[in-house]
């Protein structure tokens, strides 16, 4: 039995392959092929444009796939969300689908869009949003380079943005956010009802999320004199249960803890001052709570 | 006054810029910009996806543009064809939009497509063709990589092909040709009725076509003894009027002629045998008949 | 005293340097040089074509080298195999030297090769194989691109293949396997009899194999309630002795185990279900059993 | 409050960013920008030519910066050295500023430079050195490619060298060493007197040095039968305090130690012979003693 | 006898080599060398930073060199200008050295610079300009990236600009132009007084300028019926003397003329309308009036 | 009927394709293919290692091919030389096969090679040369990087050199030249006896040599007052017959001549001084005398 999985071709492909490799699945593909081989005989992978994956998952051509919430909605795909996966982005901010106009446009809010022309790659999501806001506008499909179409070709655009820097570079001003989007491991409904496929998907989710969690975390080990242990433990984040083991023939203990990487820059100097010795930090591949 | 011209962004861009440079128009653009500068104050150029240019020409946002006949038809754009331009292709064959199925499919002809699913980037052109052939099929928009969708995702595709080699590499078989397509310089109807814009467009057509014609031609000069002139002229292609000038203080004449490059490989050995001396071939930038 | 070691120049070089770096030996070489510097004063490294290394090891110009079994045999080199090293390949399948013919050739088996012409980079190995099979054929040295020579230039080829995909792409059919080959750390016989050199080579083998073993393995740590320990241990592969340590002031134990990476995808979900907490996976650089 | 930090633009930039990432600070910068963003709201980073950083630190435009001792001296910058950082070099040798002449020059020692012309990027440091040696020579500023100016343009050069290979390739001979230089984290004097900034700088130094220390070290774990422990401990470097923990229900102990990577190649074979089992080596990200 | 010529290393090198190739001098250089070989035994070429060439020409180490007027002035080099060469620029505008401040600075004119700090690569030229304008400011040498130093590090900069786009991208405003600069072939005064060297330099100037002139010009040939000749000649630019030759046995004439390329786009359509046939345009390598 | 032609794959391929394009034959090949398509239905082209082409021409598998004289001799191929083609080299010197030893070797002449070991890619040619010189040495086949084998692996090498710079960089000294080699268009003897194939080959030779001749030549045109014509003609190289035509209604004549490019740098200044006006130089594609 095999699980048929659609993964995004193109700009996300390398990041996706790296995530799967870290999760334990090695994908290899020849340059122009769309059918990678994978070192798990229970998986069959197809590369596709992210835009199309939810449609084919919905229709059952694929058991499951990775794509953004934006494209799941645009395809009106009725699928099961198995896991939320945040990767391959340059900031921790979510990706947003926003409506933007020229800086000097007199369109100030969504209601000003009545009767205007809007270019977007996500026509249906945009139309639905406008309808819900009681706005009647002409929404046209944009094949790309959407952000340069204002103001010469259209009055406004609905476009994906992460940091807003491309919008700023094109002198655009955001007037509304249609939705926030992250990558979803999503499944076909029938496939989800198959027990073998559901367990396979749940295991996949555990491994992928374990890999992502490990990216923002590090392992920390240190040796602590017995009488400094309480001080040290007080410094460590409360919710983390450190692993403490007694050293042989000694009144020192070894303390080991998993931390978020961004805490380390404050903790290491503090631990050192509090009497910890031989602090080492080591990298992690997976973290499962 | 300015003529607003849409040129294709992407894979055709470099070839288009080279053609315009040869025609006398130097376009320069910074890497992420869509608004090249051009050394002709009467032109304003916008880079766009070729798919969208006919739509914006039709609507009058652009006065004119370069795009394929396929996309003019897909956009149902009612525009004026100013010139046919054949460039940036690896063979002299026209580009074709064909319907293809898996080699081992039992779909043999268009009529077998009834009730089938077809993926294509050119949905309307394909639907129109099927309708005209009395076929009722489901045509879905493909965001790319169309040729790998058969047979897993769809039964057939309608895709652009030049040499057929990508179809062959994907084990596909052509069952019908929907249309042949070349690049067209096409104009908005109102712009065409403006005398200044029409003359500007006609001049542009002369220069672009003069540049393309020069690519397949070379200049040939040779010195010929007076008594061999008739023999030499008999060898040269009949329709070409060579330029003959008498040399000073000599009974030799200089013969100069413009030829198609592919004739040269047979003519040069023949001319040499017939008594021509000092044959030189030189490159051309434009040829206007 | 120094050990003189030949390493393969060219396509294997980067992978070899990475393996040595992981094993603890940093090699640096300027772009056109063949004499890398190495951070071990007891080693002297020469880069060479893999084809030539066994010959120079055999002759004692080098104490030892890395090359494939195929080239050791082709050079008829009488050397000591110190270690088998599997690296720098895209699949876990061994590399094979096979005899292949055109798909539509009427050569079906080795005996059909009588009187035929065969191109190969490994002339002697091929001749020996044919002789042992009672076949009399003309074997010619091929400087490269061997797989395109059938059927225009020769009747069959003897060529190296890993996945068979290049053979398939050239419409070739395998009719026999001459040998399977892996990379060997091999030594000159006299050098091997020198105690200092032998120990240096054995240590090198331990480190290189420890590095390779680590590539397919990961470290796994988890915290386990005392009463779940037996369940957890039952899930872990039997032959692996996990390291179990008691946590201070707690009835939990820490379990640590080294596993093959390909087992992890099944074990992690199972361990979690069985009550393990805070499972972390971390990367390894060397594993010595 | 923010600490304003100058980092070197150019050839050192990537290595610097990698070091900071390992230390826990992620810097991202768009291709032509000089103001990277950093995931620490207490830091403000500016990219600059290494030559200029000490000047701006001295003047208080920056609180601190990274630059070589050579440029601190050339700028006559009166700054506080916070930490010595050795990174981004191909060898462990220090970088030296040397005076070099043509191989066949009759300049043999510093005193022979009297009345000669010397090209260098470090004019003041060179002038000071000559003055201290009682030599009167003409020192001119070199914009680059200093090593090819001898002998046609100048008599000698004062240039930075690491391995000496570029000097050798240009047929130059070193006659004196002006100074040895490493990268310094250095601070403005007033900033150093501010308690918040001083602590921030000290923490930064701990993390950067912890990252650098980790690059040359590895973690080693092994299981040891109780009766072999003393033998094993005798093999391990004396100054390192290994972490020893008793295994549950067993008379084995787990021994864990942090070692310099260059010791490993001798220790692993020795430990194995002495009875250690399941030796694993794992990578480290930070080591704080 | 040889002429020793300094050519700019770096960003201008490729353009300079192309210009010399077109002028008839083929320069070849191995990647890290500064001494190209040239196919003229009378030339000896040295590659150098453009900043240093005028200094070495002034001092007689070189007979002549190519560098900008800006660097000739900065070096206070007393040299002979042999030829003005405009090449390797993206626009026909001259390069300018300008003083720029932040857009929102309250420095509005040169006189506002009193007491301010200015960064520049051309310290002496800037100081001289300020002195002549009665301004007393602190001018500091900038090693690069000058345009990002305003406003954090300095109050103003003096920097080279061609299109002004880098200044605009850094939100800078030009308040004064110090000088306009083009590339000069300049000679040492003594070398210029040597008759052989002077003639060599004059010939070099003719060839380099002939090559540059040819870049903006094309050759045009056409056949014209005798009775249309006057009309055609009236269309052609007055100052150009066309070459007219009578065709054999015909009342047509061949007209040939050299034109500036930018005239061609208007002339070709006009000539065609006026009765010219077989118009061809061909490229030129040198044009000497 | 088709002529089957072998062209060199690899480093010479691009230069060969450019030469054929200039000669009028456009070759296109997909990245991994060995069978280019060509716009001449009478040609069938195969790409091969240059080393193997003469063997397959000799055996009649190919009608003709391009390869060096060195490989024709090494293959002991009995073929017809159709044309000598000098292209794709960085200098006008011929390529030479030389015997080289270490600079400090005491091998001074060929006779000192008795009993020595020599590595070379051209074993037979080298053996024949040694035999003819009465020397008995061991010649071994080198798979590449031959020049670094001296002195550690062999006593001498026989290697191809063009400028000698690689030999110099490896501290080698040339003691003998075995042969000089250029690229030959060579034909199978039977193919040459076929009249159609012989004419096709002769035409090909005319076009290829015409293209090569054009690379070193330019066209020069100028206008000359009638009374200066003799002076001008006296300056032009004697053997070249210039084309002189009388200008209409004028006492000026137009002079046109084909020159070697290396003459132009002296002639243009001289012609200008002698009264020529409007001198233009234009590029050539073919020159057939």
UniProtKB/Swiss-Prot annotation, chains A, B, C, D, E, F:
Enzyme Commission numbers on file: 2.4.2.17
Enzyme class: transferase
One term under GO cellular component: cytoplasm
Pathway(s): Amino-acid biosynthesis; L-histidine biosynthesis; L-histidine from 5-phospho-alpha-D-ribose 1-diphosphate: step 1/9
Cofactor: Mg(2+)
CDD domains per UniProt: PBP2_HisGL3
Documented activity regulation: Feedback inhibited by histidine.
UniProt xrefs under Pfam families: HisG, HisG_C
UniProt GO BP: L-histidine biosynthetic process
Protein name, as recorded: ATP phosphoribosyltransferase
Native organism: Pelotomaculum thermopropionicum (strain DSM 13744 / JCM 10971 / SI)
Organism lineage string: Bacteria, Bacillati, Bacillota, Clostridia, Eubacteriales
């Amino acid at each position: 039995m095999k699980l048929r999985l659609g993964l995004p071709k193109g700009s996300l492909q390398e990041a996706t392959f790296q995530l799967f490799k870290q999760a334990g699945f090695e994908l290899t593909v020849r340059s122009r092929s769309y059918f990678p081989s994978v070192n798990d005989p229970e998986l069959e992978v197809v590369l596709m444009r992210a835009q199309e994956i939810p449609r084919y998952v919905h229709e059952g051509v694929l058991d499951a796939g990775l794509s953004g919430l934006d494209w799941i909605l645009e395809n009106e795909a009725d699928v099961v969300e198995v896991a939320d996966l945040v990767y391959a982005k340059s900031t921790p901010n979510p990706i947003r689908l926003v409506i933007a106009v020229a800086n000097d446009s007199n369109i100030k809010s969504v209601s000003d869009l009545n009767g205007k022309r809007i270019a977007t790659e996500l026509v249906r999501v945009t139309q639905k949003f406008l309808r819900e806001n009681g706005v009647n506008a002409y929404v046209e499909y944009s094949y790309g380079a959407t952000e340069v179409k204002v103001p010469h070709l259209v009055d406004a655009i609905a476009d994906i943005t992460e940091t807003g820097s491309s919008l700023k570079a094109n002198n655009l001003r955001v007037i509304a956010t249609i939705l926030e989007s992250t990558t979803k491991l999503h499944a076909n409904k029938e496939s989800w009802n198959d027990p073998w496929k559901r367990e396979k998907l749940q295991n996949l989710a555990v491994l992928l999320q374990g890999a992502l969690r490990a990216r923002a975390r590090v392992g920390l080990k240190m040796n602590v004199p017995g009488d400094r242990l309480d001080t040290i433990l007080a410094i460590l984040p409360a919710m983390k249960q450190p692993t403490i083991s007694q050293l042989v023939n000694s009144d020192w203990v070894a303390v080991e803890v998993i931390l978020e990487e961004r805490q380390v820059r404050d903790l290491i100097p503090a631990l050192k001052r509090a009497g910890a010795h031989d602090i080492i930090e080591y990298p992690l591949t997976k973290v499962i709570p």
